[in-house]
Amino acid sequence: MSERNAASARTVACLLGPTASGKTAAALALAARRPIEIVSVDSALVYRGMDIGTAKPTRDERAAVPHHLIDIVDPADAYSAAEFRADALRLVAQIAARGRTPLLAGGTMLYYRALTQGLNDLPAADPDVRATLDADAARDGWPALHARLAGIDPATAARLAPNDSQRIQRALEVYLLTGQPMSALLAAPPRDDDAAAGLRFVPVALEPSERAVLHARIAARFDAMLEAGFIDEVERLRRRDDLHLGLPSMRCVGYRQAWEYLDGCTDYRTMRDKGIFATRQLCKRQLTWLRAMPERIVVDCCAPDATVRAVDALERVLDGRAPA
């Protein structure tokens, strides 16, 4: 963004954080003080029928405060970062035009990165390249492809799990098609004529001062999901002929582990432990993304008054009192 555009840009507050950091509570608390509308930055919340395992805001919460980009895609379909970016920019403009305040809230850092920095004309998916990578993975395993990625794009590999097949494949595909690492392409600044050029995104990040506290929350939340009927939710999805574990929706944390349990591949205790471990790994990757944002305003999500602190930080951003 040029200095001229930066001076005239409209500030957009963003509430980011890992799983179980208290984003929903803080967003709803802010909504009690200001006329906000929440734009979800969460790749799992877009899917219909996936409510318990994604910790989707309740009907009452969504009735009290307008939420956007939730329940917009069938689990059999894909939803890309490019689609999110276009939808989010449109919604930010529409919400502001109504005289209300948009609040971006979520934990899908790739979406946030795409929104704020653009996609820089990343190439479209190439079926032939993907088929080759799938064959390589079938022969060598995704950890081997992750190691390959680390050799050409260490920054991207560092934030991906060795079995994150979808993102490893995409990062390798981008490199094979462009000859450039995805991290370099994403780091390029957006053009001044980009739709986001008139916006200044300011992230407030909920981060743990004590990792063990967040881990305990993750375990408690996963157990609460199980008690709320998560296995039944996955069983309903599993009965659909058009859903399978290769889909992005079924790669969401917890869903794969529950599906494998229903397939008889693991017992209940192992499923629970794997679900909690996968969530902790997701949290680790989310924090890696956040800590690469020097402009963020950090709020300790482990503090007893974390919600109050987060609301105060967001109000400072919206009132123009946050650091430039």
UniProtKB/Swiss-Prot annotation:
Gene3D superfamilies per UniProt: 1.10.20.140, P-loop containing nucleotide triphosphate hydrolases
The protein's Enzyme Commission number: 2.5.1.75
Catalysis: reaction(s): adenosine(37) in tRNA + dimethylallyl diphosphate = N(6)-dimethylallyladenosine(37) in tRNA + diphosphate
Region described as Interaction with substrate tRNA: 42-45, 166-170, 251-256
Annotated positions binding ATP: G17, P18, T19, A20, S21, G22, K23, T24
One record GO biological process: tRNA modification
Domain of life from the UniProt record: Bacteria
InterPro entries: Dimethylallyltransferase, IPT, P-loop_NTPase
Protein residues bound to substrate: T19, A20, S21, G22, K23, T24
Cofactor field: Mg(2+)
Site for Interaction with substrate tRNA, residues: T108, R130
PANTHER family: TRNA DIMETHYLALLYLTRANSFERASE
Quaternary state and interactors: Monomer.
Function, as annotated: Catalyzes the transfer of a dimethylallyl group onto the adenine at position 37 in tRNAs that read codons beginning with uridine, leading to the formation of N6-(dimethylallyl)adenosine (i(6)A).
Record family assignment: Belongs to the IPP transferase family.
Listed name of the protein: tRNA dimethylallyltransferase
Species: Burkholderia pseudomallei (strain K96243)
